[in-house]
């Protein structure tokens, strides 16, 4: 059963379109794959301190939010984020919603999906048509471990032996892709949604997913429906190094924690409001 179609405009916030909240402006910064360098974390911390309330919020889509923004700072905020490499496209900033397996390429999984995140982000930003995707439309790249496939993505790839299954609104479509063709298949599905939508924001709001024309003949695989979170603590990697996973109380980082993140080489924000 489909969800009701939307009748109002898409008001999903970004950095160019700030949401007016009770405590001031709210800007949402997309982090494809949740990836953030220490320098970028520092840029976000500085922006929040200078323009907002000094905190960062982590979201369930592995993005970050700056709250308490003063009126009229959108231009300066956007310039800062662009200089930090966090706003590569002004036209497509709200459609860069991409989840990815948190430990992909570090330990486990059928494939390293990190290069696919970068490829998908570039393809989205290069296509003028895809700027029309709703701000809540979500992509996910799961390397087969099942940590992000159950997060409610509209278009997802799920790692299987030899490639990926295309998962639409949580269901295996029967289409398969090699790593080389994986991103093209995701973009094809997104374009199909734009062709058939009539005010809907999400795939599960369509009356008939078959209208997308994205079905295939492959034997269906079981798609996990329960999120498999990465454990908290020190996690050994296949290269002999270790990753450290932690949770952020209430998903809110204060000035002290933000200062410490500057020294990190790479940070992965998780959909369960941790890193």
Predicted features, each with a name:
Residues 16-18, 157, 234-235:
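Short amphipathic beta-strand and strand-loop transition segments with alternating hydrophobic
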Residues 5-20:
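Intrinsic, low-complexity N-terminal interaction/targeting segments
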Residues 55-58, 130-134, 194-212, 218-230, ...:
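Flexible, glycine/charged-enriched surface loops at secondary-structure junctions
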Residues 112, 189, 205-208:
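Serine/threonine-rich low-complexity intrinsically disordered regions
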Residues 214-252:
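Accessory "access/gating" subregions that flank catalytic or transport cores
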Residues 2-5, 24-167, 172, 176-180, ...:
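Small-residue-enriched alpha-helical segments and adjacent helix-cap loops
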Residues 186, 190-193, 241, 246:
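A conserved active-site cap/scaffold subdomain adjacent to cofactor or substrate pockets
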Residues 124, 190-197:
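Short, well-ordered alpha-helical segments in soluble proteins
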């Amino acid at each position: 059963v489909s969800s009701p179609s939307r009748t109002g405009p898409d008001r999903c916030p970004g950095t160019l379109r700030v949401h007016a909240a009770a405590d001031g402006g709210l800007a949402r910064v997309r982090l494809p794959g949740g990836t953030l360098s220490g320098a970028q974390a520092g840029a976000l911390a500085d922006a929040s301190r200078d323009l907002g309330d000094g905190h960062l919020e982590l979201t369930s889509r592995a993005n970050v939010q700056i709250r308490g923004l003063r009126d009229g700072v959108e231009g300066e905020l956007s310039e800062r984020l662009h200089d930090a490499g966090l706003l590569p496209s002004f036209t497509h900033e709200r459609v860069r919603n991409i989840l990815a397996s948190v430990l992909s390429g570090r330990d486990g999984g059928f494939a390293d999906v990190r290069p696919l995140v970068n490829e998908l982000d570039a393809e989205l930003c290069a296509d003028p048509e895809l700027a029309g995707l709703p701000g809540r439309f979500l992509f996910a790249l799961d390397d087969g471990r099942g940590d992000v496939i159950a997060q409610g993505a509209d278009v997802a790839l799920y790692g299987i032996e030899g490639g990926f299954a295309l998962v639409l609104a949580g269901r295996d479509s029967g289409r398969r892709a090699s790593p080389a063709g994986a991103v093209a298949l995701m973009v094809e599905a997104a374009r199909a949604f734009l062709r058939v939508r009539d005010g809907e924001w999400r795939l599960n709001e369509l009356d008939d997913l078959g209208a997308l024309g994205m079905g295939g003949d492959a034997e269906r695989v079981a798609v996990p429906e329960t999120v498999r979170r990465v454990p908290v603590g020190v996690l050994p990697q296949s290269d002999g190094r270790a990753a450290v996973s932690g949770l952020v109380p209430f998903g809110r980082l204060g000035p002290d924690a933000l200062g410490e993140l500057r020294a990190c080489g790479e940070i992965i924000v998780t959909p369960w409001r941790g890193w």
